[in-house]
Amino acid sequence: MSPQTETKASVGFKAGVKDYKLTYYTPDYETLDTDILAAFRVTPQPGVPAEEAGAAVAAESSTGTWTTVWTDGLTSLDRYKGRCYHIEPVAGDENQYICYVAYPLDLFEEGSVTNMFTSIVGNVFGFKALRALRLEDLRIPVAYIKTFLGPPHGIQVERDKLNKYGRPLLGCTIKPKLGLSAKNYGRAVYECLRGGLDFTKDDENVNSQPFMRWRDRFLFCAEAINKAQAETGEIKGHYLNATAGTCEEMIKRAVFARELGVPIVMHDYITGGFTANTSLAHYCRDNGLLLHIHRAMHAVIDRQKNHGMHFRVLAKALRLSGGDHIHSGTVVGKLEGERDITLGFVDLLRDDFTEKDRSRGIYFTQSWVSTPGVLPVASGGIHVWHMPALTEIFGDDSVLQFGGGTLGHPWGNAPGAVANRVALEACVQARNEGRDLAREGNTIIREACKWSPELAAACEVWKEIKFEFQAMDTID
């Protein structure tokens, strides 16, 4: 034996497999202000105790592996290991638990959402001892938040750039999302902006396809923006999707957008990846571009109640990585979103400090230490009859985005935009006068129809349209 081997043997190394809970379940641990805290919904395999399951999550997402290894003795596990410090049963489910895990800050690279997720939600989600695993929430410590630059500009700077205050911003996704030529696409952008919208938007899968290459789209949209601004006297924008197959190509598209003088670009941050998103956010900050974020592919990760990752975690990650807008669901439209849970992560996007509130799905108190806020974007299956509810639910600091609810107007795109702008202005005025939007919403819209034939036509088209399905994402 070499002296090194003898030394290891003398301190008690014993080959083999031991229970995770012996090392990683520490119910007496007092969490530190610098720890990253995670709340996991854990469903163990039959026969696996909750303590062992929670400890396995802590181990496999930090320093642990399936067997004892010699090199454990070459570092301080007590300094670097994750710890399952609390377990609580889920009401109504005999074999499901919320397991709380604390991770030392030294486990994570500064300013890297990619590294944070690689550790916390990496291989552990395929662990055989677990039937299902879902990351419900994270507490990001102040010390780690300050290593990120966050959103390129934030809510107040965006309002100052646009010179628009006291109401939600109004947008529209151009439809059909695929198949239009660049010139016809630009025409639709112009008509919507001229009609009164603040923004129009590329859909998430509009990149650079044979029917419309990105450079042509950027040119025609920039022309539409300039023409609409000249006619209305308002600052306008179109979310030019810079998402591409490589980071280099993505930045090239953002550079061209800046050269055209447009105010905002867009990125699909989940499909594009957090490394690409953070790079684009840094470029936008340095070059005066706003950054709109689409969450395409999020439901693959967050739709199932028992497995995956809740969107509130993805929302926090986006605020770290960088984005000025992000899609958040509508509560009232065609896409998933229960009211209290949606408003919970909307507050996490906008507010500087959010208290723990399990009734809204918030597991930890979170401080953002002056990191700029992100505007939530309500988009998907909404129309003029939804305007009072959207104004009441999301408030002024939001973007309300009507795609089919603008372009589906029987008189055309510009009248569709007029209808939405009139409905929004009517709701904001009624709210400012002290009227109850939740109770009087339909009356407010009908009153506005008397002096807006465009709104009256829109109300007639969509008076029967509802999306009444039960949300999957509910409080336990």
From Swiss-Prot:
Propeptide: 1-2
Modified residues (N-acetylproline): 3
GO process annotations (BP): photorespiration; reductive pentose-phosphate cycle
Cofactor: Mg(2+)
Superkingdom of source: Eukaryota
Binding site for Mg(2+): 201, 203-204
Entry keywords, A to Z: Acetylation, Calvin cycle, Carbon dioxide fixation, Chloroplast, Disulfide bond, Lyase, Magnesium, Metal-binding, Methylation, Monooxygenase, Oxidoreductase, Photorespiration, Photosynthesis, Plastid
Location(s) in or outside the cell: Plastid, Chloroplast
Alphabetized InterPro entries for the sequence: RuBisCO, RuBisCo_large_chain_AS, RuBisCO_lsu_C, RuBisCO_lsu_C_sf, RuBisCO_lsu_fd_N, RuBisCO_lsu_N_sf, RuBisCO_lsuI
Catalysis performed (reactions): 2 (2R)-3-phosphoglycerate + 2 H(+) = D-ribulose 1,5-bisphosphate + CO2 + H2O; D-ribulose 1,5-bisphosphate + O2 = 2-phosphoglycolate + (2R)-3-phosphoglycerate + 2 H(+)
Enzyme class: lyase
Molecular function via GO: magnesium ion binding; monooxygenase activity; ribulose-bisphosphate carboxylase activity
Binding positions (substrate): 123, 173, 177, 295, 327, 379
Alphabetized Pfam families for the sequence: RuBisCO_large, RuBisCO_large_N
Active-site residues, Swiss-Prot/TrEMBL: 175, 294
Annotated site residues (Transition state stabilizer) in this chain: 334
Gene Ontology annotations for the cellular component aspect, listed alphabetically: chloroplast
EC number: 4.1.1.39
Cofactor: binding details: Binds 1 Mg(2+) ion per subunit.
Function: RuBisCO catalyzes two reactions: the carboxylation of D-ribulose 1,5-bisphosphate, the primary event in carbon dioxide fixation, as well as the oxidative fragmentation of the pentose substrate in the photorespiration process. Both reactions occur simultaneously and in competition at the same active site.
Family: Belongs to the RuBisCO large chain family. Type I subfamily.
NCBIfam families per UniProt: PRK04208.1
Note: The basic functional RuBisCO is composed of a large chain homodimer in a 'head-to-tail' conformation. In form I RuBisCO this homodimer is arranged in a barrel-like tetramer with the small subunits forming a tetrameric 'cap' on each end of the 'barrel'.
Subunit architecture: Heterohexadecamer of 8 large chains and 8 small chains; disulfide-linked. The disulfide link is formed within the large subunit homodimers.
Name of protein: Ribulose bisphosphate carboxylase large chain
Source organism (scientific name): Arenaria drummondii
